[in-house]
Amino acid sequence: MDAVNFSILAPRYGSHPMMSAWSGIGTSDMNGGAFNWGGIWSGIKNFGSNVKNWGSRAWNSQTGKLLRQKLNDTKVREKLVEGISTGVHGALDIANQEIAKQIERRLERHEPLEPEVEEETVETKSEAKAPLVVEMPLKRPRDEDLVITADEPPSYEETIKTMAPLVPMTRPHPSMARPVIADRPTTLELKPSDQPPPYSPQSSNMPVTAPVRSRGWQGTLANIVGVGLSNVKRRRCF
């Protein structure tokens, strides 16, 4: 019963589970077992070394020397180089031809430009306009003489006689002015009452006080240095 239950987990050889033979696990006897890659690599190396030895022997042999001499005489190298160069130039020529064909195809796709038709310009002559007629006024005859008359201004004496006597007026404007009636002519002299009073300096009523000298060292210092200027504050209204 236990073998049946664990047979699914056991390694298999094909379709048969391996329940007892555990020694064969991981060997080439199993399906998909180990593979010796080292042997394959060593075989490849041995085959390569053998090919190299065979080639060197053939190259250094008398037959190889004769073959090389024959190749030099027939100029095989030059022919190979010429063939390669001609092939390269031919490939370049083919590429240039293909590019030219592509350019021509793209140019053919565009619609051809229509030639510009020059428009015939017809010069239209402007109709001759009728000349303008301007009527000029008739000129006066030269025999006529112009006579200009002008009234001469009156003389100064006549003007003074016709003028009214100069009388002082009450208003500056002539329409508002009225004559001032007085026995004596007015003058610009000021009245005695209008004259300003004579200037008289005001005498100060402040008593003059002499500085009081203190006794002791303060008085001695005042005698040496002096009391200086007296400062008097006065308030005046202008």
UniProtKB/Swiss-Prot annotation:
The record marks G33, A34, V227, G228 as: Cleavage. One of its GO terms (biological process) is microtubule-dependent intracellular transport of viral material towards nucleus. A motif (Nuclear localization signal) lies at residues 233-236. It comes from the Viruses. One of its GO terms (cellular component) is host cell. A motif (Nuclear export signal) lies at residues 67-76, 219-230. Residues 187-212 are annotated as: Disordered. Induction: Expressed in the late phase of the viral replicative cycle. InterPro entries: McpVI. Residues 1-33 form a propeptide. Residues 34-54 are annotated as: Amphipathic alpha-helix essential for membrane lytic activity. Belongs to the adenoviridae protein VI family. N-terminal amphipathic alpha-helix domain is essential for the membrane lytic activity. Late-budding domains (L domains) are short sequence motifs essential for viral particle release. They can occur individually or in close proximity within structural proteins. They interacts with sorting cellular proteins of the multivesicular body (MVB) pathway. Most of these proteins are class E vacuolar protein sorting factors belonging to ESCRT-I, ESCRT-II or ESCRT-III complexes. Minor capsid protein 6 contains one L domain: a PPXY motif which binds to the WW domains of HECT (homologous to E6-AP C-terminus) E3 ubiquitin ligases, like NEDD4. All late proteins expressed from the major late promoter are produced by alternative splicing and alternative polyadenylation of the same gene giving rise to non-overlapping ORFs. A leader sequence is present in the N-terminus of all these mRNAs and is recognized by the viral shutoff protein to provide expression although conventional translation via ribosome scanning from the cap has been shut off in the host cell. This is Pre-protein VI. It comes from Canine adenovirus serotype 1 (strain CLL). The lineage of its organism: Viruses, Varidnaviria, Bamfordvirae, Preplasmiviricota, Tectiliviricetes.
